[in-house]
Amino acid sequence: MNNHQELYFYLKSIVIFWSVFLSLLEPSVNTLLALLKNSPVVFVVMAFFVVWVVCWLPLAGIIAVVLNWQINKPLQSEQKIPLLVSLYLLAPLIMGGINWLGLGSFADDGLVVNLSIFASLLLGFSLGVLGLVIVFTGQFWLGWCYLEKSNIKLIPSILLPIFLVALFVGGIEELVFRGFLLTTLEKDYAVWIAAIISSLIFALLHLVWEQQETLPQIPGLWLMGMVLVVARLADGGNLGIAWGLHAGWVWAIATIDTAGLITYTGKVSEWVTGKNKKPLAGLAGVLCVLGTGIILWYFI
């Protein structure tokens, strides 16, 4: 079976899948709504992620065929991005369906589109980038790394694309994890219990895409999730600062990695600078995130 035949097979399967799915769903909407409203929030959270993945799998199948990806082989970056984008584009649609069922709203989840969110977004973005500038400046001064000056010329061509990706990824992840997930868990748990659980889920789900390099980052990712909860609280329950902060971190780190701007000297353990060149897997990155959280807690 060639690629065109496989693609046709997947498209036909998707049409059949959705026809059967919708025919089964239609008479059960009221029953489902009553069940969700009276269920523990853990069940609601599980239902959200299951529906999200089930809706995405047909798209993932098509993308896998188009990209000629074999499931027994590791994902390449050019294969990962289309899969990630297709998954993330579905999240607001799934949440819109939840809101349509009367189980919440985007405003409840912290997404209020007005002028103030742009100010908060800018504040968070600036804070995220500034924190990393301070961390890397300190590492330059201590001789832990140096700047690859010959690669600076690569920056102008990648700044905007990476910025748009960072804004998209940060926005979707904040809407899901500090928005829907945190708000839903708060219905049954105190805010800090909800924060701990949502941040743990946020950290562990990063293992889906890559395990070896992600595993050392799990504590840092959990702390990052907690700080982003603080950012939402500092913003009066809105997601603006958290979204900007998240996007700023992603944009700065991705720009450094893509352009190859930093080379580590090996003067200190990589557990200080970041295992596998990942700041969240090292003491410096963790202190950066922790310091940002302290600033948010006491000064914003």
Where are these regions (language model features)?
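Histidine-centered divalent metal-coordination motifs
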Residues: 174, 178, 206, 246, ...
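Transmembrane alpha-helix boundary signature
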Residues: 100-107, 135-145
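Membrane-helix interface segments
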Residues: 77, 105, 116-118, 155-156, ...
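N-terminal, membrane-interfacial amphipathic/helix-forming hydrophobic leader that caps
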Residues: 2-113, 227, 239, 251-300
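Membrane-interface helix caps and helix-loop-helix hairpins in membrane proteins
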Residues: 206-214
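Hydrophobic alpha-helical transmembrane segments
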Residues: 46, 121-125, 159-160, 192-197, ...
